[in-house]
């Protein structure tokens, strides 16, 4: 494995929420227009798990994000930006032998990724060796990480093994990305991980692609033992199965500018409410409220703490 520089960990309270996963530099049109004709682009960090940590931090939950970045200007910018959101980045490291990944948002048309052999794709179990996962209340990661590389899949397995049996709960967002792996390979791997998690987030559309599920009940049938199973159905709403009960909360009517990142915002809103001890309906509503803010923006995140954080290119 290439040498990876360790971050200097400073002493401090263990965050209630620890997230683990890749973050790239995202370039997005400043306005809701196609990438092909946009004249101004903005730079923002973009990554499922750092998004969750940033949203949760803005909601008052002490949160940390763990990852590996390149030893480059983009990596330094990402770390600084996420830290300014109030996220604990003491366990973020830099790999001098690999670059930070980049991706472009094309509003309404998808995303273009440039992440091959990125620093984060070289993460492995050693990435979390010094992270006190067992002392957090919730550890959150997603299925994206498993698809990045074999060492990243080993990282996910190590996290699951360490959190199992500890006082922490394991939160897992299925986050299936067809651009990273085919459904034939992803379906059994993601189902196995979801069955071992305490809290699972999955979109009904991705459950259909992966496991031929048509209804929330179909998803519950293949994940019957999950402590809290949250199934998101776009502009319809979200269903939670927990403690032998089923609850549904309708989505908030919203004019969607860009959907990418809304799932991360939902997870953060839900987890923050769960850490506050809120009941099911409040948890689901908190997820919808946070997701709505992202749906109204071209960014994965909202409420930038420093106006100058966005640079035009």
Language model features with spans:
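Glycine/charged-rich beta-loop-alpha catalytic/anionic-binding loops adjacent to active sites
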Residues: 30-40, 141, 245-254
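Active-site beta-loop-alpha junctions enriched in small/polar residues
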Residues: 116, 144, 175-179, 205-206, ...
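Conserved N-terminal subdomain of the carbohydrate kinase-like
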Residues: 62-143, 311-313
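Glycine-rich phosphate/adenosyl-contacting loop at the front of the ribokinase-like
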Residues: 2-87
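Conserved phosphate/ATP/ADP-binding segment of small-molecule kinases
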Residues: 166, 179-246
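Active-site metal-binding loops of divalent metal-dependent hydrolases
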Residues: 23, 144, 174, 265
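Conserved phosphate-binding/catalytic region of the ribokinase-like
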Residues: 1-18, 216-313
């Amino acid at each position: 494995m290439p040498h990876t520089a360790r971050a200097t960990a400073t002493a401090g309270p263990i965050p209630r929420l620890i997230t683990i996963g890749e973050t790239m530099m995202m370039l997005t049109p400043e306005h809701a227009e196609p990438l092909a004709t946009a004249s101004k682009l903005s730079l923002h960090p973009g990554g499922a798990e750092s998004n969750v940590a940033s949203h949760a931090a803005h909601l008052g939950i002490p949160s940390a994000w763990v990852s590996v970045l390149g030893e480059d200007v983009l990596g330094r910018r990402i770390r600084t930006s996420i830290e300014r959101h109030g996220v604990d980045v003491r366990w973020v490291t830099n790999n001098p032998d690999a670059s930070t990944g980049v991706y472009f948002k094309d509003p309404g048309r998808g995303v273009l990724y440039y992440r091959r052999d990125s620093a984060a794709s070289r993460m492995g179990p050693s990435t979390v060796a010094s992270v006190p996962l067992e002392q957090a209340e919730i550890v959150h990661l997603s299925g994206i990480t498993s698809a990045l590389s074999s060492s990243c899949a080993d990282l996910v397995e190590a996290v699951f093994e360490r959190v199992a049996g500890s006082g922490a709960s394991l939160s897992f967002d299925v986050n299936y990305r067809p651009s990273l792996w085919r459904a034939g390979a992803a379906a059994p791997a993601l189902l196995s991980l979801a069955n071992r998690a305490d809290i699972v987030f999955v979109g009904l559309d991705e459950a259909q692609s992966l496991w031929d599920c048509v209804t929330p009940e179909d998803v519950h049938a293949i994940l019957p033992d999950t402590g809290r199973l949250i199934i998101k159905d776009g502009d319809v709403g979200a269903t939670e199965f927990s403690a032998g009960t089923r609850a549904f909360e309708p989505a908030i009517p919203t004019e969607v500018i860009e959907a990418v990142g809304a799932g991360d915002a939902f997870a953060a809103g839900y987890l923050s409410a769960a850490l506050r001890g809120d009941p099911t309906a409040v948890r689901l509503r908190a997820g919808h409220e946070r997701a709505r803010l992202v749906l109204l923006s071209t960014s994965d995140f909202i409420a930038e703490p420093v106006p100058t954080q966005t640079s035009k290119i």
